[in-house]
Structures are given as C-alpha cells and as structure tokens.
C-alpha cells in the first residue's frame, strides 16, 4: 500500500505546483542587425556579421547596449525577492575592513573601508601612535566614483609614492606621484601603462608601457611590444628613456624591479599566466648590458634580492 500512496502524493504535489506556477515571462530582445562582413584568412573566408559591435564608441553600439540593458534590468526588477537579497547582502557586508599597514619612513599607510564604501580609502599616520588621516579617497576622484587607484611603488628615500590610476574599469592606467609628507600630487603624468608597477631608482622609476594608440583606438588597438622605460621626476613623458624592448616577441609582458640598494635592475618576462624568464642589469655600471639569469618559461621565477653577490630567486 505504501507505493500507491507515495505515487498519489507525488501526483497531488505536481498538481499543486502546476496550479501555483506563473506563466513564464517572455523577453522581447532587441533586434541585432547583421552586416555583410567577410574576412579572408589565407584562402578561408570567415563571416563576421557583428563586427560593427567592436566599435564601442559608435552611436549604434551605444544604442544597442542601452537596449540590452533595458531588457536585462527590466526583468531583474520583476523578481519579488530581489530586494530581500540586496538587504541581506548589505547587512552582512556592512562592517569596517582594514588592510595590513606598510611603512614609508616615519609614516604608515593602510586602507580602510567603513563598510559600504565602493572603494577602500587610503589613510596615512605618522608613527604607530599617530592620528590617521585620509591620504587618497578614490571615491572622490570622479563624479561616478569609478576611478581605481593602487600604490605601485615607494621611493627609496621614502619621500614619494607612485600611484596607478585607472578609469571606468579600464586596464589602462596612468602613473602619478605624490609627496608622502605633504600629501601633495606632483605634475608627473605617465600614460599608456598596463600591468606595471613603478620600480624606483634615483630620482625616478622604471615602468612598463606601450606605444600610444591612435585616437579613438584606445580600447581596440592591439597591445603588442610592451617596453620598459625610465621616468625622471619632473620630466614630460616624451623625455622618458627606453630601457628594454623586444621586437621579436610582440605578446610578451615585462615587469621591472630594483633591489633595495638600487644597484640591480631585474626584468621578469612572461608569455601568459605562468612561467617567467629573468634578466638582470648592473646599475652601478653605465650602460651595462642585461644578462639572462633564468632562461625559458617552464617555471615561475621571481627575483627577490641580491645578497653578498648572490641573487635570491623565488621559484
């Protein structure tokens, strides 16, 4: 008797579910036009009818995105339990958060988020017992709060800090410099930087960058042949010195680093998300050549420091 009763229970449950189920919402998606675009790759023709969408600055593309967003958010707003989810997430995420502090001479810097700030704020204090003050608040750098910043390097004398600044989620960043003690921003502007820190040496720093893309191609041009430059504080960017370039491998990335005593310059090259090749240059010798330290990209290798004439490498 148990099996028939169980089947009856399932049947009644299915009827109840069917009676309560609302009619599925039918979404009316905007029409996406197709264009007559065909590319010939070594004799193989490939149709690309949506090529026009690659032009993110075109009015047609902007209108298409707005129409798509209208459909998406129009549907999301009909979900009855969505506000409850938002309220609960807001509740559990609303607590103060701090980063570990890092030292710059007699100052300490750290980030803090009061709980619901879009981005954490950089604070500075003098000594361990000093009163924290706002150093940089990225939420105030643009009307929409989408400017992202990150500290990418502190000068050896602890006087200056290099800051990477990106807008609207772009990978492109601009390096600016601030005097730590006065919280004053200098006039330096280093543009067309991607995936790079600032390796300080003397009165300037090394950084990785690309050639300036053509006007209107900033988000479409290929990122090839990343180079390493040296920027001297106070100079315009067109005076920066080219330190490294590789004309044979357009897709390689390169990052520069210096030792604490500023005697050595490291270059870490990569071809993807894993594997790195390491080169080193003696900065105490004028125009010294780069020497290959770790060859190939089979392993991850990251130089740490030079101690007693020996290079410490994390692998």
What name fits each language-model region?
Residues 1, 19-20:
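Generic N-terminal leader/processing signal
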Residues 1-7:
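Bacterial N-terminal signal peptides that target proteins for export
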Residues 7-16:
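Bacterial N-terminal signal peptides
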Residues 20-315:
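Beta-propeller folds
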């Amino acid at each position: 008797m148990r099996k028939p009763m169980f089947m009856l229970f399932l049947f009644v449950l299915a009827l109840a579910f069917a009676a309560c189920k609302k009619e599925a919402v039918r979404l009316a998606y905007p029409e996406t036009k197709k264009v007559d675009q065909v590319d010939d790759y070594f004799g193989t023709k490939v149709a690309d009818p949506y090529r026009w969408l690659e032009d993110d600055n075109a009015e047609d593309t902007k209108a298409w995105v707005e129409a798509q967003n209208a459909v998406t958010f129009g549907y999301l707003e009909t979900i009855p339990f969505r506000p409850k989810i938002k309220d609960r997430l807001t509740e559990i995420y609303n607590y103060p958060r701090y980063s570990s502090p890092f030292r710059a001479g007699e100052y300490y810097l750290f980030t803090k988020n009061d709980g619901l700030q879009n981005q954490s704020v950089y604070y500075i204090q003098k000594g361990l017992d000093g009163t924290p003050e706002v150093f940089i608040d990225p939420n105030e750098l643009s009307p929409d709060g989408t400017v992202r910043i990150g500290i990418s390097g502190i000068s050896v004398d602890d006087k200056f800090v290099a800051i990477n600044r990106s807008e609207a989620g772009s990978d492109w960043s601009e390096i600016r410099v601030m005097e730590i003690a006065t919280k004053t921003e200098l006039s330096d502007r280093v543009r067309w930087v991607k995936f790079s820190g600032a390796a300080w040496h003397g009165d300037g720093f090394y950084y990785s960058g690309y050639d300036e893309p053509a006007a209107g191609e900033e988000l479409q041009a290929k990122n090839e042949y990343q180079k390493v430059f040296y920027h001297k504080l106070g100079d315009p960017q067109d005076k920066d010195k080219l330190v490294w370039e590789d004309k044979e491998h357009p897709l390689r990335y390169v990052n520069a680093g210096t030792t604490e005593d500023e005697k050595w310059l490291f270059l870490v090259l990569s071809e993807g998300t894993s594997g790195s090749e390491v080169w080193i240059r003696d900065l105490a010798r004028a125009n010294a050549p780069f020497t290959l330290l770790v060859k190939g990209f089979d392993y991850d290798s990251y130089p740490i420091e030079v101690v007693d004439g020996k290079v410490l490498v994390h692998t």
